[in-house]
Amino acid sequence: MLAIYKREVRSYFNSMIGCVFAAFLTIIGGVYFMVYNLYSGYPFFAYSLAGVIFMLLISVPILSMKSFAEDRKNKTDQLLLTSPVSLVEIVLGKYLAMVTVFAIPCVIYCIFPLIIKLQGTAHFLVDYSSILAFFLLGCVFIAIGMFLSSLTESPVIAAITTCAALFFFYLLDNLLQYFPSSAISNLVIWIIIFALIGLLIYHITKNQMIAGIVTGIGYIAGIVVYFVKKTLLESLFSTLLGHLVLTDIFYNFSQNYIFDLGGLLTYLSLIILLVFLTVQTFEKRRWS
């Protein structure tokens, strides 16, 4: 894994993607810092950091688009698939390389609260916990991009789909009000979701039986719940998706001044899940 990690880190900086990515986020964070903290005198760097989140939606897809898609495009993925290194080590090596690139501006951000302290009052607990939440949020975004990159051989398609997915999560809080609340509407959404889950399972495993069983169980469960206790389906998906408003966890740190340990665990759980899905996608290609 260490060899893959070093190779990936080297490739990011040799191709300038890593340098541009780190410099871009550092400059954007510095601009917000000057405007809000130095010129306006606002004592919380966490407030400035909130403005950088939008830039992650643009920069992360560029960082993650080549993680697997470029290997498939250049056919160099066959070397990885036939190497003695486990798939978990391959995926983790690539993922940790991207996280390392992202960590550079985050480490630089740690200097800004110290500068605020030189000017007056600083709130280290809020600022540094917000930087931690920002870092983990970025790691989730990178994991999303890596997973989507593993599904295609086109880096451009990987970047576009990642950008679309990140914008969806960014706007999800505003979109929830448009989700239907009736039981029948949520049942239809339930059926569509399990159909997509079945397709995803088949895409990963190429096993029609497993995909069919999972889809069938989902259909039956949804229909049974609808006829037995349909109130459970009312506003079901708007409630569930409300827990996937990833930016709200960060805002708990930066704006509500709450150390949201459960939110950090949510970030870590999503990272583990997406890494696992990427490994399974790679596993399917090894045997196909």
PLM regions and their residue ranges:
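Helix-loop-helix units of permease transmembrane domains in multi-pass membrane transporters
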Residues: 67-97
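Alpha-helical membrane-protein architecture signal
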Residues: 2-6, 88, 92-96, 124, ...
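Transmembrane helix segments
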Residues: 155-253
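Helix-loop interface residues and adjacent transmembrane-helix termini in multi-pass membrane transporters
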Residues: 84, 151-152, 258
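Secretory targeting signals
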Residues: 29-36, 40-48, 52-55, 97-164, ...
